[in-house]
Amino acid sequence: MFPLEEITPNTCSGYRDQRGHTLLYNILSGRASGYLNTKLNHNTTAHNCRCEQRRTVCLKDPKATCQVASSVLVKTIHFVRSLPSFNQLPSGDQSSLLRHCWVPLFVLGLAQEKIAFEVTDAPNSSILRQILLGPGLTEKEAERPTLAGVHSLRTCLHYLWNLDLSPKEYAYLKGALLFNPAVQGLSASLFIVGLQQEAQRALHEVIHLLHPEDNFRFSNVLKAASAVQTVGHSLVTELFFKPVIGNTNMLHLLTEMLFVQ
């Protein structure tokens, strides 16, 4: 099962609320992210015109920021590989789970390490160009990071920073997001259901232990779990890793990092 003792000791075992399990399962599986995604988009675009939000952007200091982002990704893969229960899964399931959840885990890593970044207009990007090209944008251009996407990512990060999660809370939240039985094509889905339930139980318990007077913290952490799943894979890849890996396939790179000793 999920190696609770590998991540943090001294958790109690009183939580058995199946309704909470169902709610958290839906959120962690990405099924309840629509509401928060709409709320995030409203917050980030309420005071900005649509054409402004479509502006394509890039990192202001790509060398330094990409180096930090790469370090966060390496730590993320190390966390995943360090879980004995993850290593017990078939290699195909391991690959599928990582491909599905690497962005939420990476965003949690950015938040945990308090990584801030600045962006600037991408070369050859202008509001007029975005308006004129509109639906005629090529696939490559459409994948470029937009100001709206960066705003959404920053909103997620600030939400997590305001929660000020402990290392234990981050660890269990990562575990609950990693073991997602809703991922298509899993051969050990029932086992993964148990792993996610154990992770979410431990998350609830550690929140109760660390914040016994905060009755809303658990639900706020659930909102954070939903928020990180709204961040697009292409945004993270293009913004933080494309300047380094070029045309290398990001999913292939992740698979190599996972299985190469």
Question: Which residues fall in each region the model found?
Answer:
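Intrinsically disordered, low-complexity regulatory regions enriched in Ser/Pro/Thr/Gln
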Residues: 1-261
